[in-house]
Amino acid sequence: MTGKIKVHIDPKGYDEKPSGKEIGGIKSRLQKDTSPSLVTLEELVQKVETGHSISPGIMEGMSAKDWKEQQLFMVDIDNEEDGPILRIKDAKAICHDNGLSPAFYYQTFSHTKEHPKFRLAFVMDKPITDEGMRKYIMETLVNLFPQSDKSCVNADRIFHGTNKSAKLLNENGRISWEDIEAVSFPTQKNTVAAMLATQKCARIPN
């Protein structure tokens, strides 16, 4: 069954990477002035490849504390770390090895053949409404890819669209909380439950 997901989409598209005051305008339109859209993945990919920025987190304001829920999770692959360049085929192989099905990907405004920059999109099978779970999902996904931008984990993160290639891999592609739990790293010592408990405690005001 093909389902729709909720996401903030900037009504204005760009032919090149936004900068300066444009970025502030995008954030205001996305998270303050624009209600979330309910779209199919095909519709979302069409918006992304015509330069529309998106906010995967459903917000009731412009800061991370205003986050309410999220079903779409994005990973930035910027290839800025030392080590081998990670290309789309390599990222897809990592997903396959870990039982994760990315829904779509797209090359960013800054992408070149020599220096690939792209984003992978994952869709949960249901919206996430717990901030601790959101953070754990995001950190698990970014840590899975050696050339990902580890700073792109905040709840109010905005992702710009592109003027380059975007590809829908699986309209019905979804991942579950159990899929995320099954991803393991050699240096990961905390259990999921322990991490969530710690994150929830950290949110309790003094």
Region spans (language model):
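Signature for HUH/AEP ssDNA processing cores
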Residues: 1-116, 123-136, 199-203
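Helix N-terminus capping/helix-initiation residues
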Residues: 40, 87, 149, 175-177
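A common structural junction motif
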Residues: 98-102, 139-149
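Long, charged low-complexity interaction segments
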Residues: 104, 182-206
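Short, conserved secondary-structure transition motifs
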Residues: 111-113, 123, 150-174
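Short, well-ordered alpha-helical segments in soluble proteins
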Residues: 128, 141-145, 165
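Mixed-charge intrinsically disordered linker/loop segments at interdomain junctions
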Residues: 168-186
